[in-house]
Amino acid sequence: MEELARESISLLGKSGLEGGTPSLSSMGAIFIMLKSALGAGLLNFPWAFNKVGGMHTAIMVELVSLIFLISGLVILGYASSLSKHSTYQGVVKDLCGPAIGKLCGICYIINLFMICVAFLRVVEDQLEKLCDSIHSNNTLYAMSEVSQSWYMDPRFAITVLCLVIILPLSIPKEISFQKYTSILGTLAACYLTVMIIIKYYVMEHPVLIKHEFSSNAASWASMFSVVPTICFGFQCHEACVTIYSSMKNKCLSNWAAVSVVSMLICLLIYSFTGIYGSLTFGEAVAADILMSYPGNDVAVIIARLLFTISIITIYPIILLLGRCVIQEAWLNHREKSLFVTLTYERCVRVVITVLWILVTLLIALFVPDISEVISVIGGISAFFIFIFPGLCLVCAVESEPMNTKAKSCLTAWGAISVVCGAFVFGQSTTIAVMEIIAKF
């Protein structure tokens, strides 16, 4: 995300966004790319690996997707160098025109909104396990059959959390005080990977271990079902333009190396998590891997707390990004008919914030599990990973002098990216909607 990227660059003392000299190193760029990509998406990988039909098929799909992921990053760096913009939307609008730029802005808001839904769904899952753990340890509960108290209901807990903690953190116009906690998502992801690997070897009584995965069982439909999870997990393309603009060495080959290294590290982390998580639980693996582990396991409780705290601190930043786009569009529209005061701006900010939190909370409360949310996010992510980079490449080569053969090859690759992105969006979104309807 662009705001996370800016804050990371600021923390490294490498800011090049305010007119200064860009001085972000390649290692710093890799670190920020990892920070932008690693997060709550990791929880869904073991489930996706099992659903796709086994580790071999899942890794093959990952490797094919990696070609497009890296290609999109390189294209966006190239497009940024041509447009001289430091934001994703600015690059798309400059190269592809205002109409595509508006579409990019709409997709950007929807993507941020659904990420917030996924975050709240993850928090609710963790609160459910924590409440169950506290409730099961109650000696009175062991002696009676009294139902769980209403205040131990995770839906009540997540509602209180949103109103008491997340809402006050999200209302301020500036939330720079939270930038030091944004690394918690990366820390939680790395901790989860190590924990899953260790648990695979030390667990004495795993739940329904199934090590048999038949490659023949993986149909084309099941193969494509893992793509939304990959798109959500590896998604850092919105931030990459800001990162590239802040780099000292903007050579395209250097940016390509940064993209390859960061994506390969993500590949290792996600693959190890998916492999060991699916091997541990087999078909019993939950859409949120932490839900498959016992509620009273200390190591798992630490992972739940890390993810919960990281989401609580990152949610307001994601909300800020979406709110800024909506608020800017609304205020620009109102300025044409009346003078906008500070009081009016404050009221608009509060209303957008409250509505954003309430709607995302309501959706998170009624969505069956995180897999459906990730399918929708993965479909929307296809615009940022496949479609917009492909369009930028097609538009860029038309304005750049180059030989006919190179122009034809690049145009063809851009068209392939757009077509693949449209397919991923349509397929994943349709399946997600159908699965949600079927569960209700």
UniProtKB/Swiss-Prot annotation:
Q: Which cysteines are joined by disulfide bonds?
A: none
- Which domain of life does this protein belong to? Eukaryota
Keyword Electron transport carried by entry: no
Q: Name one GO biological process term.
A: sodium ion transport
Pfam families associated with the record:
Aa_trans
- Which chain regions cross the lipid bilayer? 29-49, 58-78, 100-120, 156-176, 183-203, 223-243, 255-275, 300-320, 350-370, 373-393, 418-438
Which terms in the GO cellular component ontology are assigned?
A: membrane
The UniProt keywords, alphabetically, are: Amino-acid transport, Ion transport, Membrane, Sodium, Sodium transport, Transmembrane, Transmembrane helix, Transport
Query: Does this UniProt record's set of keywords contain Nucleus?
Result: no
Q: Where in the cell is it found?
A: Membrane
Family assignment?
Belongs to the amino acid/polyamine transporter 2 family.
Q: Per its database record, what is this protein's job?
A: Putative sodium-dependent amino acid/proton antiporter.
Checking PANTHER family in the record gives: AMINO ACID TRANSPORTER, SODIUM-COUPLED NEUTRAL AMINO ACID TRANSPORTER 8-RELATED
Q: What is the name of this protein?
A: Putative sodium-coupled neutral amino acid transporter 8
